[in-house]
Amino acid sequence: MDAKTLDRIYEISDRRVHETDLSFRRYLCGSIDWSQRLVSVLGPRGTGKTTLLLQHMREAEGPAQPSLYLSLDNIWLSTREAYEVAEHHVKHGGTELYLDEVHFLDGWQTLVKNLNDDFRRLRGAYTGSALLRIEKSGGDLSRRQTVNKLPPMSFREYLNFEGLGPFEPLPLTDILSDHVTLARGILSRLGVVLPHFEAYLDHGAYPFYKDAGQHFGDMLRQTVNQVLDVDWPKTENVEPQTIRHARGMLSVLASTPPQTPNVTALCRELGVDRKQGIRILEALARAGLLRLLSSGAKKLKSLSTPDKLYCGDPNLMGAMAPKPDKGTLRETFILSQLEAVSTVEYPPQGDFLVDGRYLLEVGGAGKKYSQIADIPDSFLAVDDLEIGRGNRIPIWLFGFLY
């Protein structure tokens, strides 16, 4: 690679790092062990993976640890050229390399493995699509790295991003045991919480909402299309017809209340067999576009039908369904917040079994606790409620889990 191109790469890296805003950080930034030789950050498109990487570089920069940012979605950059850039970087004193959007580069697994093997004093991180399956990737990467997953923003992060904080995350056990005190403390600072919560459900899960403004819904739908048309084919062999089936399946499910899905009927409607239909659902779930809720027994079975299907988050649901059902929005919100920090299963009673112990039933302000009152560690997550009482917890408070 010629010197002019290398200079250009370093100029782009320096500009991207120093133009990065540090005023707001995603929660994951402080949880990653950046001292590891190889760190990966995977997550749905639009959640802020690139910004997280650049923020860390800016905060950690110094003459003793020269670093380089390299985006692999450049169409002119081959695997061999990316390796040459890394080799030049190390030979000239570089000790850190940060690769962005690795799934755009064919053979990225081999590149990362070779860099990890050939340059022992080089450490760094890479970002990639949530569709990547590290455990099945080439180069035996799973044992070489720490994998970190970045979900959409929580309600707490949205409040901080809006300048209404700072608020710290709350453990689930604290929310369940002391929700009245916690809710009062938050309300004393916010004044009102429900209008902010409604805004979050509409647009607050993706940081790009501030730039998108009134075009947020269009941009989110465009993001979904990019996941299906660009990211998915980059991460595995998938036929254009399968992508069309996935888009149709997503459209149907976005406007359907969560229920035990008739996958056979859905597949018949879309013209695919059951096995292919389940695989499409699993791909949409990996991408963060859907959430598949199953009982503990079904989770152990390959290609099993999930007990319930949800959109990935309330913003996606609102963007793809003209008038989303309010009850479905509630459940989608709760599941999206819980799955970032806990294991969630479909229970015989109630809506969600959390960490194998806590039973949650989700409902509106008129929801009665009597249905689950005899079950230990059972709680109601209630909408349109500022402060709860007893085992009735305001639904918005679960947005403080991360």
Language-model features: locations:
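Interdomain motor-coupling "hinge/lid" segment immediately C-terminal to the ATP-binding subdomain
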Residues: 2-16, 129, 135-243
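Conserved P-loop NTPase "ATPase switch" module shared by AAA+ and STAND
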Residues: 90-108
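Accessory nucleic acid-recognition modules appended to NTPase machines
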Residues: 205-348
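A cross-kingdom feature that marks ATP-driven nucleic-acid transaction machinery
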Residues: 1-22, 32, 42, 55, ...
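Walker A (P-loop) phosphate-binding loop of P-loop NTPases
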Residues: 45-46
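Conserved lysine of the Walker
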Residues: 49-50
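Short glycine-rich substrate-engagement loop in P-loop NTPases that contacts/grips substrate
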Residues: 64-93
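Structural recognition of the conserved hydrophobic beta-strand(s) that form the central parallel beta-sheet
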Residues: 98, 123-129, 149
